[in-house]
Amino acid sequence: MWKQKGAQGNDPYLYSTNNFVGRQYWEFQPDAGTPEEREEVEKARKDYVNNKKLHGIHPCSDMLMRRQLIKESGIDLLSIPPLRLDENEQVNYDAVTTAVKKALRLNRAIQAHDGHWPAENAGSLLYTPPLIIALYISGTIDTILTKQHKKELIRFVYNHQNEDGGWGSYIEGHSTMIGSVLSYVMLRLLGEGLAESDDGNGAVERGRKWILDHGGAAGIPSWGKTYLAVLGVYEWEGCNPLPPEFWLFPSSFPFHPAKMWIYCRCTYMPMSYLYGKRYHGPITDLVLSLRQEIYNIPYEQIKWNQQRHNCCKEDLYYPHTLVQDLVWDGLHYFSEPFLKRWPFNKLRKRGLKRVVELMRYGATETRFITTGNGEKALQIMSWWAEDPNGDEFKHHLARIPDFLWIAEDGMTVQSFGSQLWDCILATQAIIATNMVEEYGDSLKKAHFFIKESQIKENPRGDFLKMCRQFTKGAWTFSDQDHGCVVSDCTAEALKCLLLLSQMPQDIVGEKPEVERLYEAVNVLLYLQSRVSGGFAVWEPPVPKPYLEMLNPSEIFADIVVEREHIECTASVIKGLMAFKCLHPGHRQKEIEDSVAKAIRYLERNQMPDGSWYGFWGICFLYGTFFTLSGFASAGRTYDNSEAVRKGVKFFLSTQNEEGGWGESLESCPSEKFTPLKGNRTNLVQTSWAMLGLMFGGQAERDPTPLHRAAKLLINAQMDNGDFPQQEITGVYCKNSMLHYAEYRNIFPLWALGEYRKRVWLPKHQQLKI
């Protein structure tokens, strides 16, 4: 059986800044589990397949991890009897209290011993294939991946194949060329054959048919072209230039990569190395076979130069501008021929040397986690090409388990983990219940994790020269070892520490030193845009919109420059206002000015219908929930703010007949609110709307819409306190969705806890913030 492990480092090429607190990985133990437990796992796998067929639910429920942690906790989840409200029965205090207690008990049971809540953070079908390609070209695929790994990786790909035979870019998406080609290639590299696939339904052959019916792999978007070129089943001549020489320009250069969004910068960095070296792996019999399998004409007859701008229409979301195509053509026809010849090839060598220097620095400062799975796979490819026997390659291999996640739908590569983000949201949800004394042990563990996850030092040396920012005092999305600042994680973590500081230390643990709070404030104030007043994610926003014209991805939007985001801005307002409340006098004027600018940014970016567009969740419901919470913390209310009134009106106008809310993922690329098909309800999104309405004062004015939504949540709760997994609710870059498996527990608990506190409990002393 598979076992989830955590807070351990068992490899000489692993190292940590905090003794691996927050690390999570999976290990196969052949002798683990009773026959009954193994049967439960198989049942979970069958239930997933049936649920997907009957109800169209693609995301996993994380059943393998949950079953393990629930058993290890020893908590009896069925000791509180289930509760259902009849059609004509109204919500009452006892009903909501029972639902909250059951949800709290489940959350205690699935909390890891180091304080975080392990959960899948995945959903993209573009995450895993690059890693498999990296392992294949380096000859390590059979040493890093066991038979059990391969079996579960294959299971995942088969489970998420679409009816038409193709695969999407993410698990709920329509079939695309990049999703289909990469999934097909991955299956073949893992040993699946053409004649008959293990699923008994000819899945490999059906996938190949979709690819050929839609023009063949030559139409794969640019990221896919790079991956295939490294594997050796596409020619570099068919890729638009990614010159490493760009890294040699002074930082004042208008198009210097240092001005790019960190994830874009760090992804294209190893891409430019691989392009500059024209590297490809060994041309094996399987590679030669793939060359013939995925194209409509013989490989030798393909005119590669004509494929540089070729992108399948099913994939195209962000078309190249004419200016961009002229830039690529100019580099391809004029620069590249010179850089291949002496003496200009010396410039290429200098560019490659600089890229290697930057890759090494970035990998070291993230403990070889890198900024995410995209860079991770590309760095593995690059270090294999640079020095197969080097320590960098070995360090990278040692961190691969951190990216592999297994659930009932199989094994996949996840982002880099959402440990900190899930923990700080869950912590606020627990605090909102007002049952702290009853469930304080859970808060004590979460408190420990949050404190241990704060970054304690800046990157070493001249980090600005290495395209990095200061980090001391910040929190990441995952754990301290990741080392990359995230604005909303820092703000929400700061608020958690401030909330917990008002509670008895014998219940929630010791407070952090106040200097740690000051350092977090320093980070937040630094991250604000001096122009707009908004906040981005990793670094201060870059007011260089012309750079977005060079977005080469075709499938993602807003990836080139660091942009402000609604939800990040709202979270920072919450964090700064909470700090000001408990620590007046420290940088008070700067905090007040910062919050005032941030509020103006939010007011300027409100949609005509009263909503706000969220970048990291779907989408208008998500953005509006965060914004109203930010406004509430800054004293903006329904009575004194037109923006709040419009936001509340948006929520009330989009509530469906059964009392819930549901928003389709189509809202994200279209940037227009789109209800779920049939105007059905999503429980997580319903919770967002409930919370947003309560932050907008709806409980005091007219709680009727909240009663309807609360009844829906109570009746949807399962006997063990869990809530059913429904549609995917996360997103990034407007056109790719992300599954946050813990959301279905965090947000219904938070919404019901806040509802119970605001509607049903008598007025009494609350926390100050």
From Swiss-Prot:
Q: Where are the PFTB repeats?
A: 457-501, 518-563, 595-635, 644-685, 706-747
The feature of type site (Transition state stabilizer) is located at W421, F477, W616
Record field: catalytic activity: dammarenediol-II = (S)-2,3-epoxysqualene + H2O
**Tissue-wise expression:** Expressed in flower buds, leaves, stems, petioles and roots.
InterPro entries (alphabetical): SQ_cyclase_C (IPR032696), SQ_cyclase_N (IPR032697), Squalene_cyclase (IPR018333), Terpene_synthase_CS (IPR002365), Terpenoid_cyclase/PrenylTrfase (IPR008930)
- Which residues of this protein are catalytic? D488 (proton donor)
Residues crossing the lipid bilayer are 612-632
Predominant localisation class:
endoplasmic reticulum
Q: How is it used?
A: Transgenic tobacco plants coexpressing PgDDS and PgPPDS1/CYP716A47 accumulate dammarene sapogenin (protopanaxadiol, PPD).
- Cite the annotated pathway: Secondary metabolite biosynthesis; terpenoid biosynthesis
Where does it live in the cell?
Answer: Endoplasmic reticulum membrane
Per UniProt, subunit arrangement is: Monomer.
Q: Which family does it belong to?
A: Belongs to the terpene cyclase/mutase family.
Q: What is this protein called?
A: Dammarenediol II synthase
Taxonomic lineage of this organism? Answer: Eukaryota, Viridiplantae, Streptophyta, Embryophyta, Tracheophyta
